Amino acid sequence: ATALMLSWKYQIPSIILTDKTLAEGAYSFDIEALTPHPDLEPALRDGTGEYRRYAPTESGVSPLAFPGRRGVVVKANSYAHDEAGFTTEESGVVMGLQEKLLRKGESLAAELAAYPAVKTYGARGAGMTVICWGSEKWACIEAAENLGARVVQPLVLSPFPDRAWNETMIGAGKVACVENNATGQLARLLRQQGFDPGRSVLKYDGRPFAVDELKARLAEVFA
């Protein structure tokens, strides 16, 4: 729900990462226990003046109007364009529109700073930290409890929550990234953000981790 509302407010696509186990599984949950989210209203055109789809704003989000509205022409252009959507090669205009996009990214990052972008399970200072995403979380939590380790699960990957992540990883000790893929996708992304997990535990035979299997492999890499 949060991803959809932010997508609507900031006029951007939202990608919700899933995996094979989640896609093929069936789960039950208490809908009443879900945290309610406030409606995020989009910046809509007020109906006055000439419509500029890419008008500069402080937040970087331009007023939205839908194609088919009377008196409105909505232009979508994949090339560098001006505020109305017409192609341009004027350097000042191109720079201004690029800076508008950067402001939008900054506004989104500022709003996400209030969102719990990183979840943790277990006590800080355990000396061992398991990083995971997706359906591996449940096996990781159980295996980590047996090993006396802590589990860290990033919930937002872009814009990456640098401050929350760095605060969470203080005193992490030995770190391993557990993933159900062959290339260590999350570990690679973390390295791009300046954090190297150092160890990876990968499984890519199309099956989820079993707790005993994961516990043995974590004990091996943490030894």
Language-model-detected regions and their locations in the chain:
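Flexible, low-complexity linker and terminal segments
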Residues: L4-A223
